[in-house]
């Protein structure tokens, strides 16, 4: 993508220095900012590519490394890494807050409300970020698992939510999707819940067997539309 620049950056969060993949459009800013939260594999090529796609669409995108450099393609190892992170969920959220703060402070980012999206484990973190972190302008969790959200947590969400699920997902089931939808309805959270009928878990990841190109393309356009409506037009 010749119309963007990318590099690894350092930012402060959770009381330490963290690394992240930053993708920025070329040309004159400012642009809205988006944090992209990894799956359980780590900060690998697919997540970096999602950040790059955001930059090509006119966003400054930062994908924080929640595993401190560890990346795997083996499910057993990914599960171990994810379980370790889950035991330090609040620390991971603090790193994500650091990534949000980095974008808020970035000269080329405006407005100072940041979009957040994540996939699988990152989807779960997106839910919790929307409920617990500051400076979030919109949230798009993809098939987000992780620690359950209570109705009290959901009631703290202040930003619009686009919640994306797959009907064939055996891990984060349609029942979970419907439960989250009911909680957002009760809390009067502006939201849309989409359960794609022919989509499995990880349908957005074009490096995985579950990838569904048509569904992924539709989800991408819906996500861009939300971020443009809530972030770009508020400048």
Where are these regions (language model features)?
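Serine-hydrolase catalytic machinery in alpha/beta-hydrolase-like enzymes
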Residues: 7-109, 202-208
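Alpha/beta-hydrolase fold nucleophile elbow
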Residues: 108-119
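Gly/Ala-rich beta-loop-alpha elbow adjacent to hydrolase catalytic centers
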Residues: 118-122, 126
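A conserved short beta-strand
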Residues: 135-145
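Short beta-strand/loop motif that positions the catalytic acidic residue
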Residues: 157, 163-165
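Acidic catalytic loop of the alpha/beta-hydrolase fold
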Residues: 168-172
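Short alpha-helix in the alpha/beta-hydrolase fold that links the catalytic acid
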Residues: 173-183
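C-terminal catalytic histidine-bearing segment of alpha/beta-hydrolase fold enzymes
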Residues: 185-235
């Amino acid at each position: 993508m010749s119309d963007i620049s990318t590099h690894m950056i350092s930012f402060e969060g959770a009381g330490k220095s963290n690394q992240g993949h930053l993708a920025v459009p070329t040309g004159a800013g400012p642009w809205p900012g988006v944090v992209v939260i990894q799956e359980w594999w780590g900060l690998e090529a697919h997540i970096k590519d999602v950040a790059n796609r955001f930059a090509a669409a006119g966003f400054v995108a930062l994908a924080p490394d929640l595993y401190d450099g560890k990346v795997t393609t083996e499910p057993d190892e990914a599960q171990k890494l994810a379980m370790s992170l889950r035991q330090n969920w609040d620390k991971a959220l603090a790193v994500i807050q650091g990534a949000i703060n980095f974008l808020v402070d970035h000269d080329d980012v405006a407005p100072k409300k940041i979009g957040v999206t994540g996939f699988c484990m990152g989807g779960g973190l997106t839910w919790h970020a929307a409920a617990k972190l500051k400076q979030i302008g919109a949230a798009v969790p993809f098939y987000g698992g992780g620690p359950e959200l209570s109705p009290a947590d959901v009631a703290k969400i202040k930003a619009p939510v686009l919640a994306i699920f797959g009907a064939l997902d055996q891990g984060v089931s349609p029942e979970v999707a419907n439960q989250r939808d009911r909680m957002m309805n009760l809390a009067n959270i502006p939201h849309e819940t989409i359960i794609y009928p022919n989509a499995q878990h990880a349908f957005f990841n074009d490096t995985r067997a579950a990838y569904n190109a048509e569904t992924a393309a539709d989800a991408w356009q819906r996500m861009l539309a939300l971020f443009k409506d809530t972030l770009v037009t508020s400048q």
